A protein has these predicted regions:
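Short amphipathic beta-strand starts and helix->beta connectors
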Residues: 3-8, 72
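A structural signal for short hydrophobic beta-strand segments in well-ordered beta-sheet cores
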Residues: 10-12, 78-79
Length: 208
C-alpha cells in the first residue's frame, strides 16, 4: 500500500457459498494491465466471481472513492442474514460477522417489542438490513441513509425479499427526521446503528 503506486488496495467481499467480489483500488483513473489482473485473479482465485476497479485519488482512511468500473463477472453478491437475502455491491455497508449481527438484530427486535402496527424509523439504515428485519414485524418502516448507493441497494433488497412496508430515503437522518416530525409523523420506535452524536441534538425533537 503506497500512495504513489498505481494500485493502493485490493478489497474483498464474501457472499453466500464462499463467493468473493474483488475490488482493485488505484490512485489514478487507469488500471494498467487490467485484462491481466482479471485473468490472473480468475486463474489463481477460482472463488472470485466478481471484479471491480475503483479509483481513490484522495489520501486518508477511506478505502473506496466514488469512481467505480465493473471489469468482469457478477455485479453483486448475495448474502443471507436473519432469513433474508441481500444483494451486496462494492459500496454496500454489510455486517462482516453475520452470526454476531444476527444476535444483535434479534436483541434489537426484542427491545422494539413490535406487534404489527408500529411505525419504525431506522436512522442510518445502510443497505436496509435492520430495516427489513424490522419490517417483518412492524406496520411501517422508514429507512434513512445519506449514501445514495446504499439506499438504492436497500430498495432492491426490499423488492428482492417481497417486502412492501419499508420505504427508504437518501438524506441526512439528523435533518430528515425533524422534517418528518414537523409533517406530523410520530414513530413508535427509532433504531440507530451506530448511535450518532450529531443526531442526538439535531433530532431531539422527534426522539423525545
Amino acid at each position: 500500500r503506497t500512495a504513489g503506486a498505481a494500485s493502493r488496495h485490493i478489497m474483498g467481499r464474501v457472499g453466500d457459498h464462499g463467493e468473493v467480489m474483488a475490488v482493485i483500488v488505484t490512485a489514478s483513473g487507469k488500471l494498467p494491465l487490467a485484462d491481466l489482473w482479471v485473468s490472473e485473479m480468475r486463474k489463481l482465485l477460482p472463488e472470485v466471481v466478481s471484479i471491480y476497479h475503483n479509483v481513490q485519488s484522495h489520501k486518508g482512511n477511506a478505502i473506496l472513492g466514488k469512481e467505480i468500473h465493473h471489469l468482469w463477472g457478477k455485479k453483486t453478491l448475495t448474502s443471507s442474514l436473519c432469513g433474508l437475502a441481500f444483494e451486496v455491491s462494492p459500496f454496500s455497508f454489510f455486517q462482516v460477522h453475520k452470526p454476531q449481527a444476527e444476535l444483535l438484530y434479534e436483541k434489537a427486535l426484542a427491545y422494539a417489542d413490535l406487534h404489527g402496527g408500529e411505525t419504525v424509523i431506522d436512522a442510518y439504515c445502510g443497505t436496509g438490513t435492520i430495516s427489513l428485519c424490522l419490517a417483518q414485524k412492524a406496520g411501517r418502516v422508514i429507512g434513512i441513509e445519506i449514501v445514495k448507493e446504499a439506499i438504492e441497494d436497500a430498495k432492491k433488497n426490499a423488492a428482492f425479499n417481497h417486502i412492501e412496508n419499508a420505504e427508504f430515503y437518501a438524506a441526512d437522518a439528523g435533518e430528515f427526521m425533524p422534517k418528518l416530525y414537523q409533517e406530523g409523523l410520530r414513530p413508535d420506535v427509532i433504531v440507530m446503528d451506530p448511535v450518532r452524536a450529531a443526531c442526538t441534538c439535531r433530532s431531539a425533537g422527534i426522539s423525545q
